């Protein structure tokens, strides 16, 4: 049984972790351009120029500058609270995971179909969205 004052060891490496290796002083330097190359190779293999970013800003930044011919779509999830819609990180993280599952289950391959996401009360908002940031709103959380 875990008690309130029990110590817990870290169970994953955060991207911001300082970790000195021969490749650099943190995980960004350790990975270098390997992750970007892998993602771009996968897009090429899929014959796609669409990259749906469901990562946090911290993790997505490991890709570095994405080539201009890649269409990066970064959905935003907003919940209604205190009279307005705003991003609540806890719910947004969960929504990104829900969308990832939904994309796989529905075999979504284009931006238009992404707008059909309607899981857990989120609905696409044309008025709030841009060409690279589709916004999904939810009244109840």
Segments and roles (model prediction):
Residues 1-129, 135, 139-141:
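Internal, well-folded beta-alpha domain core
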């Amino acid at each position: 049984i875990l008690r309130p004052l029990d110590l817990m060891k870290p169970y994953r490496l955060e991207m911001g972790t300082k970790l000195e290796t021969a490749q650099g002083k943190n995980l960004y330097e350790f990975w270098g351009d390997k992750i970007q190359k892998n993602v771009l190779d996968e897009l090429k293999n899929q014959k796609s120029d669409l990259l749906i970013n469901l990562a946090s800003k911290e993790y997505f930044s490991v890709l570095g500058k994405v080539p201009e011919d890649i269409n990066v779509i970064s959905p935003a999830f907003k919940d209604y609270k205190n009279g307005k819609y705003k991003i609540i990180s806890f719910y947004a993280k969960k929504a990104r995971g829900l969308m990832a599952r939904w994309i796989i289950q529905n075999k979504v391959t284009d931006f238009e179909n992404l707008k059909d996401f309607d899981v857990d009360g989120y609905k696409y908002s044309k008025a709030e969205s841009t060409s690279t940031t589709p916004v999904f709103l939810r009244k109840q959380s």
